[in-house]
Amino acid sequence: ACLARGETCKDDCECCDCDNQCYCPFDWFGGKWHPVGCSCAYTNKYVCDHKKEKCKKA
């Protein structure tokens, strides 16, 4: 089972397809940057290749 675009994730490898990465936008809050949560988002071929390496099943 993998996560579709827009679903909440913790890691790139959880997101379906190679052009789907776990993206964490940041919000300004009280003078500090903090993550507002990560979700699977469309990405480019560079990340695609990186993800293939990183996410190979052991």
UniProtKB/Swiss-Prot annotation:
Non-toxic to mice. The presence of a 'disulfide through disulfide knot' structurally defines this protein as a knottin. The lineage of its organism: Eukaryota, Metazoa, Ecdysozoa, Arthropoda, Chelicerata. The keyword GTP-binding does not apply. It comes from Phoneutria nigriventer. Keywords: Disulfide bond, Knottin, Secreted. The keyword DNA damage does not apply. Disulfide bonds join 2-16, 9-22, 15-40, 24-38, 48-55. It comes from the Eukaryota. It is found in: Secreted. This is U11-ctenitoxin-Pn1b.
